[in-house]
Amino acid sequence: MWDSAVTIIAIFLAAILMFVFPLMTMADKSDDVSQLSIQNATTDFTNKIRTTGYLSQDDYDNFILTLASTGNSYDAEITIQKLDQNPAKKSSGDTTTIGQNVYYTMYTTQVLEQLPLSLNEGDIVSVNVENTNTTVAGQLRNFMYKVTGNTSGNIVAQESGIVTKTTAN
């Protein structure tokens, strides 16, 4: 009887070592590739906006298609802080600033409604991307770590920067 119990436990452990851990490793590598792809796409998208000072519907659509190409679903949030400068004319030849420069914020829905959008030098662009589905690696981690209470990580990318060039579009 004791030998049967040990044999069953050994078979169970062998199955875990031979099938579950390699599956978890491959799923984690898939998530790593998705993370790298999403981070690169987010960086490229943000840098294009920063260096051109312009955001078009085609640029946004291409970004969303790149995100979707990983096989996951994502929530992409765009935040643009537009610089509202406050120059005042003191006399005909003298320009001074009265008060402070203020940024006003546009969020994703406002940005998408105003496409194409031209930005000015000094505006701030932020793009945050987070997956909305649970990946295979996340499901396996949740199953394996259910006892310990660990949660699975998300695929997240963040990028921001200041617009350095203004286009005349």
Annotate each predicted stretch with a short phrase:
Residues 1-5, 79, 161-169:
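Low-complexity, flexible helical/coil segments
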Residues 126-169:
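Glycine-rich, aromatic-bearing surface loops/beta-hairpins
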Residues 2-65:
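Alpha-helical assembly-interface signal, strongest on the long, hydrophobic N-terminal helix that forms
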Residues 42, 100-104, 142:
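Generic intrinsically disordered, low-complexity segments enriched for polar/acidic and small residues
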Residues 5, 10, 14-15, 27, ...:
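A sequence-composition feature that detects small, non-aromatic residues
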Residues 48-117:
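Short amphipathic secondary-structure patches
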Residues 21, 67-69, 154:
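Residue-level signal for the start and early helices of compact helical domains
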Residues 121-125:
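Envelope-exposed proteins and targeting segments
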